[in-house]
Amino acid sequence: MTSLREMFDVVVIGGGHAGTEAAAAAARMGARTALLTHRRDRIGEMSCNPAIGGIGKGHLVREIDALDGVMGRAADAACIHFKMLNRSKGPAVWGPRAQADRGLYRAAVQALLAAQDGLTILEGEAADLELTADGALAAVITGAGGRIACRAAVLTTGTFLRGVLHFGERTEEGGRVGDAASNALSARLRGLGLALGRLKTGTPARLDRRSIDWEALPEDRGEAEPAPFSLLTGRIANPQISCRISETTPETHAIINANLHRSAVYGGRIDGAGPRYCPSIEDKVVRFAERPRHQVFLEPEGLEDETVYPNGISTSLPEEVQEAFIRTMPGLSRAVLLRPGYAVEYDYVDPRELTHALALKKVPGLFLAGQINGTTGYEEAGAQGLLAGVNAALVAAGRSMVTVRRHEGYIGVLVDDLVTRGVSEPYRMFTSRAEHRLSLRADNADLRLTPRGLDWGCVGPARQAAFAALAAAVATVRDGGAGSEQAAAIVAADRLYEGYLTRQESEIRARAKDDAVLIPPDFDFSVVGGLSAEIRARLERVRPETLGVAGRLEGMTPAALGALFAALRRPRPLAA
């Protein structure tokens, strides 16, 4: 462990998808960065499904890559099955998705971090936070009693905050199988007066590839020419594999229904809300009782790995029940479970405690990213981690923090939704959440965000050169010349949506006027006449940074927004 005299600019707590992006981003910004994690060998672990991207999620990966992040390059290095989802629709909502070899992905992330100058990896548990007399962050205290002094820190604790694993009627503490929970840190956050809640997620059993009757199942092929996520990847080098498709049956549902009382969720042992768009098989059977079957995609977890991920049957039923219902599905009558599925319940911090820079309002110098903010998914976590890491480095250097606005990227949509509306269930990104999705395409992420990254200082020379070449090629195609296939696709999409984009630009300019009206951090909302008690309470709770953010709060009316604008224009009384 680091000595008491050693000082870092930024400490990142947690080595998952948010933590790796935060640590790498802070180090790229020139900050002397430490990544503190329970186990170095688990950095970059894909704890649930072996895939990166999807509808909305793929856009986030492309944006992470445009800002020189890790996820896109690691996904390309590990891709073994690729699909462009939504291809039958317009290019604005195409969703690149890569199934990954878990081992290759983890190795790629660890290699990218090892090659990053200015980044030190430390093993240990963060147990406490030391604050200055003014309430700002001063140091991270480890479970072993070590003190890591820092100017800023990023908490990326995933499902580890007071995490509890549920295997049917059996429970045990942990953030995931094989890793301990972070109980002391959760207690510390409560002690800081932060609003914490409880959420849950789950994962299915893992199956032995050798016990599956593959020939009895229809094949699910990927695309012959997988498209890389990263601008820095020439082509995907890995062999591409096929998946297979099974399905639940009426017999499957009968077994599940007969054992619902033994499920951790339906047995009343879990209080936290689960992800609406990734329900457990118990939820599917109960909520969609009229459906006799549900598809299950059998996804190999690696080229040399005998483990198979059965996508679609996340569960918290006891292991023997899981084995029984799985063996009622086509091709799985002799299936062997390598590990049972389980649910994990964990603490999260109400994201309305944060600014748009992902900084805690109550603790200067402390940032939060990932599932601790109420999101679900690797991609959502990585996007938050990158932004938080950039801002932690800026704070450590005494510079102003930065944000991404809704019309600039899905990262901006994600953060704005979190900090203005909060969450009551794990938040997942979809293209439908972005009102400017025609211009926020996966194909143009580099053109949208790499210039921002260059201004911030988080983009390295290799990406800068690749971006310059892409921008030049796009300009050539727009002028009628010949360019790369990638540049031609970007220009074609722009022309397809040209009329809509022109109209959208005027809407963005109008919204920018509200976003330019700042609300002082200590503004007294009680002086604003005409506000309902509900709206006033929500303003006090969220304390929006601008008039534009206030206008996006749930329940805000045009009349209330006008009253707030009028109050902001009045001169503020001088302090006595």
From Swiss-Prot:
FAD binds at G14, G15, G16, H17, A18, G19. PROSITE patterns: GIDA_1, GIDA_2. GO terms for molecular function: flavin adenine dinucleotide binding. Coiled coil: none annotated. It comes from the Bacteria. NAD(+) binds at residues 274-288. Its cofactor is FAD. The keyword Cell membrane does not apply. One of its GO terms (cellular component) is cytosol. Keywords: Cytoplasm, FAD, Flavoprotein, NAD, tRNA processing. GO terms for biological process: tRNA methylation; tRNA wobble uridine modification. It is found in: Cytoplasm. Homodimer. Heterotetramer of two MnmE and two MnmG subunits. PANTHER family: GLUCOSE INHIBITED DIVISION PROTEIN A, PROTEIN MTO1 HOMOLOG, MITOCHONDRIAL. NAD-binding protein involved in the addition of a carboxymethylaminomethyl (cmnm) group at the wobble position (U34) of certain tRNAs, forming tRNA-cmnm(5)s(2)U34. Belongs to the MnmG family. This is tRNA uridine 5-carboxymethylaminomethyl modification enzyme MnmG. The gene is mnmG.
